[in-house]
UniProtKB/Swiss-Prot annotation:
GN (gene name): lptD
Pfam families linked: LptD (PF04453), LptD_N (PF03968)
InterPro entries: LipoPS_assembly_LptD, LptD, LptD_C, OstA-like_N
Signal peptide: 1-21
Places the protein is found: Cell outer membrane
Organism encoding this protein: Saccharophagus degradans (strain 2-40 / ATCC 43961 / DSM 17024)
Protein name stated in the entry: LPS-assembly protein LptD
Similarity-based family: Belongs to the LptD family.
Taxonomic lineage of the native organism: Bacteria, Pseudomonadati, Pseudomonadota, Gammaproteobacteria, Cellvibrionales
Subunit field text: Component of the lipopolysaccharide transport and assembly complex. Interacts with LptE and LptA.
GO CC, any one term: cell outer membrane
Keyword Zinc: no
GO biological process, one term: lipopolysaccharide transport
Major localization listed first in the record, in broad terms: membrane
Keywords per UniProt: Cell outer membrane, Membrane, Signal
UniProt function note: Together with LptE, is involved in the assembly of lipopolysaccharide (LPS) at the surface of the outer membrane.
Amino acid sequence: MTKRYFSLLAVCSAIATSTFADDTPTNSLSLGKTYLRCYPQADSNQWDCAEYSSETNLPIGRSQIQQAPNAYDFVSAENLTPAAQSALLPGCTGMYIDPLGDQTNAPSPENTPLIVEADDSVLTGSQKAQLDGNVQISQGARSIRADSMTYSRETEEASLAGGVTIRNPGLLIRGDKASMSTTRNQASFENAIFVLHGQHIRGQADAIRQTSDSSIVLEGGSITSCEPGSNAWSLGGAEIKIDNEKGQGTGKHITLKVGKVPIMYVPYIAFPLGDQRQSGLLFPSISSSDNGGLDAAVPFYWNMAPNYDATITPRIISGRGAMLEVEGRHLNKSFYTESNIAYLPNDDGGQDKDLDTLVSNGDITESQAHPYTGQNRWLGHLSQQGGSASNGGWYSTIDFTKVSDQDYFRDLGASSFSEQNQSYLDQRAELGYLFEHWTVSAMAQNRQVLLYDLDTPYRRAPQLNAIGHYSVNGFEFKLDNELVRFDHPSNEWRNGDTLITGSRLSTDYRAAWPIRGRWGFIKPEVGYKALGYQLESDGLASSAESSPTLGAAQASIDMSVIFEHRGGSIMQTIEPRVYYLHRAYTDHSDLYAVTADGQNVNFDTSIRTFSYSQLFRDSRFGGRDRLDDANQTTVGLTSRWYSNNSGRELFSASIGQVFHNADRRVGLNGEELNTGQTSELAADVSVMLGPLSRFYVNSIYDTEAAEITRASSGVYYHSQDLSTLANLSYSYVRDYRQSSIAAGTTEATDIDQVDLSFVTPINKQWSLMGRYNYDFTQAQELETFLGFEYNDCCYRVRLLARKWLDSNIASLTDNHDLEHDQGVFFEVHFKGLGGSGAKVNSILEDSIRGYQERERRNKQ
């Protein structure tokens, strides 16, 4: 309590000095039932009090101080207002409600009168005042209640007895007895309980000391976020300090109990209150897998300043050793920076029974089974966003991630950093400036490959861009210039031959005249693309051109008309679209087979995946090493159905095809091209099955072979509160190929997979979750897990049993029984004491569509 709150106690002295003169008899004098309203004098140390003859004369504000509905101000869900019910967190059966309500806009207590009420008041001279029977003192939103109260003017101390209750906004304290001192600015309560309404935290103690409006100290007490009647977990000890204003708690000689069972002791602890992040321990994540054994991580959050913090996570992996992970964040007016480092010294090599079986059978060697034994393994990551690109001026971007080896994430994962399902780790830095019409930038980029069967991309060291945009009298002009220096982390290709390196200048200049309206759009465009190279002579064939140049003019027109039909509650549109593209052929022979081993000049280019959206692109290649010739017309048709009431799209269907007016001649690697007169048929369908569910189909159909070459379909559903999620998808690709930088493609294979994932509540506290991902081509499971979540206001527990394909073992054996890892992942989060680990969250967010949004909703 602060000095302004202890002015409540001074009213007892005010009663004596304002009611009687100095010659008041020294013997006791009873005044009977007392109603007083007091205002501070100018010096704020003396009071003017006026007595009211009856309770009806009390000010309106007095009636707002109501007796609490129960000891903890806990209101069950059925008795909450509709607004409070909608804010009730999952698993909670009610919430702590401050009877004073929201005091955000209430007047300051210093500007409100002090109200005193008692059944009887007794004065002993001018030094002692006693209030007896239903003592109630209030000033604004602050109040004191007790059966009796005695104040000594000489010692400036007060004592209260019998059902003592003190309220501040968001804080309730009750005790059998209390003593207060205006000189020490302190109040203490015996055999007391307290509630922090907003943080959903309560506690009890042998004694509670209140040193400010928002700070209390528990002696011989405990705290919990569990609802009244439950002590599933509690944090208790010799001394616990709660600072509600800072959102932080500290404790000495603390024991964490689950029920009545102590599970952890620490001599000192700092912890956050609620889910806001303050310095202190976060709760651990524990998992076990075939590969690493038992894995336990205990994060510590360090709030160093309002604009920078760190999370330090010691981890112990039984099969590999002890490691440390550190995440740091920094924010100022110009930059946001995030960094991660992790280090595992002297890897023990892991423990994998499947690999040991292969070693015992003589299928692989010990070094193949445990290639990192004795090695130091590490991760480094830096991400930075700087400047203000949206408002013009300078901007910068850094996205750099590097690991010690390709198997780092497979073996170790990361408790505070996620790079799940990544083929590459980007290592990129960019600096740019936005002018009114131009954007200029310089960028350097490298990528670390995480998969063994992928080629390592070229490095860009550096890349310079200058892109201009102008609009003049309805015409739009784009001037795109790019200069890149390409080299390679390895000077030699896998076969030992020298890789092609060099520089490339590319330009793409365009002029368009777009016309748009409710009826549709039309966009004629002309342009010219050019390429120029300066190739390093090392490795080039004697007949190869070291400075090849290419150029091609192009023209296109894209147009669509929208026809609408309204009938009843539905509006239907028919949207035909026609796109014509012509680009002149330019000879690419100077880019093919320029080395003795037949390498082609191809730094960053691949064939785009064909889809409905690809129908209306101006190139079939991704990248800038090819100027593909084109003389083609694309015809597409889209129909949409909208609800006239809600405006939602209920149904959409699109179908389209490219008609080639001439054979294509430019290929990726100089190969003979398909000279068919039409492309495959592309179609997309999306159907809203209900307000919260949608079905989709995307397919590519080869009209010549009369077969589907690529298809994906699925249905997904989520409940209004996101407690239920359900996803089912199917994907098929015939003859899937991966492009190679040097010479063509890898071996073709089919992809034929189904993926089912879900989260469904069993009741208010229990939820079931799972995933089943199966590959029909290989006749094996890619990932399967089943788990449950228990979630109430007190704590959350998640347990997953997971089985997933180990790509490393799969490359060493044909035995499907040995190709999978299995693991159990466990996390517990004691609510009110900060966040939990990230491993289970990472698995669920990567595997179940909508889970990340579900988590975000649950924290609101």
